[in-house]
Amino acid sequence: MTWLVIRVRANQGVERSIKDTMGHLNLTRVNHAVLIPESDTYAGMLKKSKDYVTWGEVTAEAVAELIRERGRLLGDKPVSDADVKAETEHKSIAAFAAAIASGEATVKDMPSLKRVFRMHPPRGAKGWGGIKRAFTIGGALGNRGSAITDLAHRML
């Protein structure tokens, strides 16, 4: 499985160790997103930065849409099926996304693909729904489970 992690809150007043942890996750700005494999190491990092990020398990379709819409190559060029085929053993963005979602591949397997996806703030009337509260009580922070796909779709 793979987690999609999105930064919700800014750096103002953040403890140094948490700021460093988010730096290790490549989440340096608000509305940036990364795809990380599900592991104990990353789970600890997410637990530490839970008051500043939101995350959840992502599907292959959502990963494919994310790479198509917001994925960028070095030089800020959009990603195409030809680029994926040339740099990986996968034939298309959909196949590469399925491998990422299942945990067989990572974003690092395509060297020219930037690891950070620059997202738009959430569209719609609700927006974030409160950036100071946990998702479980109506806010935006912490683990969302599969609901991360809806948020990612609103941010594309």
What are these regions (language model features)?
Residues 1-156:
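Core subunits and conserved enzymes of cellular information-processing
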